[in-house]
Amino acid sequence: MMSEEASGTVMGNKERIVTLTLEMIYLLTGEHYIPRKKSDDGGALHAPGSVIQKENNKNDKKILELMSNIIQLLTGEEWGCLKTNTISHGETKKENPQQLYLPDCDYEDKADININLNATVCFDNESNTNVDKGANRWEARNVPKSEFLPEEQPCAANSIKEESELCKAEYRPDCSFNPLGKQIQGTDTPTANVGSSMNSSLSDNYLLKTIKEEPDSCEEEKLSDYKIITVSEPVAEDQNPAPSCSQNNRSLPNYVSNTIKEEPYDEEHFSDYRIITVTDPTQVAGTSPHSTENGEYDSSMAACTSQLSKSALNVMFNCNVCHTAFNNKSNLVRHQRIHTGEKPFSCSECGKCFRQSSQLFLHRRNHTGEKPFSCSECGKCFKWRSLLIKHHKTHTGDKSFTCADCGKCFKKFSRLTEHRKCHTGEEPFVCSECGKSFAQSPQLDLHMRIHTGEKPFSCSDCGKCFTQRADLNVHRRTHTGEKPFTCSVCGKGFTRRTQLNIHNRIHTGENTFTCPECGKCFTQHSHLLAHQKGHMGKKPFCCSECGKRFRQSTQLYLHQKAHAGEKPFTCAECGQWFKLYSILVEHQKCHTGEKPFSCSECGKCFKRHTLLTEHQRIHTGENTFSCSVCGKCFTRHSHLTAHEKIH
C-alpha cells in the first residue's frame, strides 16, 4: 500500500514537473504545448496553442518561481537563492561546487557526480546529437540563464554533497565535464555530449535546472534560443553531422543547438522530456572558445572550427582562364567577357557594341550631345569628368609634372614624356617618303599630309582648307575679328601668340636678327631675309602683267592690285579707296588729327613712324643717302632722287 502511494506521489510529481516546465516554456517563447501519450504508430504530436506577443521583463519572477518548484519536486529541497534577483546561482556556487544525489534511485558505485553550475552538459545514451540550426530566437531581456544537467547515473541519496575539488578534465563516466568552460547564453555553440558509456535506463533520467540572473544591462541578443522538437521518429545520425577530430584518441564533443526536445510522454518514462541549452563561450572576456574546463587549449576543436569557418566563408569565384579571383559572381561574368570577346550591349544609333552597360551609357552622350559636367569658373561643359578635371588646371595653373633637365612644368604626364625627347634627341618616328624623323607620332601624321596633300579641315565661311585644326581655328579669327592676344603695353591685339611676341620686341628694343652685310637689325627673321635680297640684287617675284620684279611676295601682291584697280579699303569720312588696310589707317589720322609718334629731342609729332625716323636724322646729322656722282649726302631718299636729276 505504501509502495502504491509512493508510486502515485512520484508520478504526480512527474506530471507536476511536466506541467510547470511547459508553463515556463510558454512564458519564454509564447507558445503553448500540450503533451500527449504515444499513439499506436509510435508517433507523438504536440498541439501548439495560440501564440502571443512576448512581454519583456515581466515574466522573470514567474519563471523563477516555476523553476524553484521544479527543483523542489526533484530534490525535495527548496533553493533559497532563487528568490533573489541580485545574486546569480552560478556566482554563489562557484567556490563550493556541489554534488547531486537524485531521489528514488539506487546509488550503486557511490561515485560522486560533480555539478559545474557555470557549464552546460548534456548526457544522452545516443552516440550523436542532432544539430538543429533553425532554433527560434526568443528576445526577452533579463531572462534568467538556464543550465540543464540530465543525470544518467543512478543514485540513491536525495541530498547534495559538497566536494572540495572539481571534476578533472578527463572524460570519466561518473563525472560531468564541459570542455567549453564558462559560457554566455544566446548563441549557438558546440556543447559536449559526455557520458555515452553510461548504461542506465532512460526512465531513470532526471532534470536539474539552475537559474542565473542577468544584470539589467544585458542585451536582448544575449538570451538563449529555445525550440520544441517532437521526436516521433528516430533521428538519422547523419543529419547535420558535427565535425570530429582525433587527438590523443579523444573525440571532439558533438555539436547541439539551443533546442528543447519534446518526446512522447509515458507514465514510466518521464525523462523523455529533455531540455538542452547551449551558450557561446566566445563572448566571455578572458576565455577561449577552444579551452577546457581547467584552462587547457584544445587544438583539435580549434582545427575543426577553423576548417568549418573556411568552408562556410571565403567563397571566391575564380576565372578558369587566368585564375583571377572575385568575391562576386557578377564581377566574374563581366571579367570573362574579356576572354570571350562578348559585347552584349549595342548602340541603337551606330551599332557599336560594348562589354558593359555603363560603357554604352557613356557612349550615348556622343549622339545626344549631353555634357553633364560643367566648369564652375567659366561654365564650359564636358562629356566626361576626366576632361573637366583637366580643364580645371587651366584656371588653377596647376602644372604637376616638371622636367628634371630644364625645370619646365607641364599639366599632363604625356606632355612631359614628349618633352623629354628634346633632351635625349630621340626621334623614333621616321617618314617613309623623305626619311625625316620626329619625336612624336602626331608630328609624323601631320607631316605625312604634306606628301598626300590631305587637308581635312575646311573653313565654313570661305571654304579654305588646312592640314591642322589649329590652323583652321586661327583662320576663323579673321572672319570673327577675334584677337585674344593683347599687348600689355599698348593694348594692341593679335590673332596669334607669335605675332604678340614679335610685337613686344618693339617696346623692348630687342633686334634679334642682324644683317651681316650692313649690320642693320630687324625684329623678325622674314624682314632680314627680305633685306638681304637687296644686297644680292635678287628679286624673285615677278609681275605677270608688266614684268616688274620684287624682293617680297607682299610687294608683288600690292602691285598686282594696281593693275586690277582693286581698292577694297574705303575711308568712311571722305570715301577715298586704298589698296592696303595699313594705308587706310594712316589716312584716317588726317581726319582725327592723331599724331602718336613724337620726337624726343624737339617734341615734334608725326602721323607715321617713318616720318619720325627721317626727322631724327636732322638731330643726329646722319646722311644715309649720298650721291654717287658728287658725293652729296641727304637724309631722305626722295631728296637724293631729286638731286640726281640735276646730273
From Swiss-Prot:
Q: What is this protein called?
A: Gastrula zinc finger protein XlCGF48.2
| Known role | May be involved in transcriptional regulation.
What ranges of residues constitute the C2H2-type zinc fingers?
Answer: 317-339, 345-367, 373-395, 401-423, 429-451, 457-479, 485-507, 513-535, 541-563, 569-591, 597-619, 625-647
The similarity annotation says: Belongs to the krueppel C2H2-type zinc-finger protein family.
Q: Which GO terms describe its molecular function?
A: DNA-binding transcription factor activity, RNA polymerase II-specific; RNA polymerase II cis-regulatory region sequence-specific DNA binding; zinc ion binding
The main location class comes to nucleus
GO biological process per UniProt: regulation of transcription by RNA polymerase II
Identify the keywords attached in UniProt to this record, alphabetized.
DNA-binding, Metal-binding, Nucleus, Repeat, Transcription, Transcription regulation, Zinc, Zinc-finger
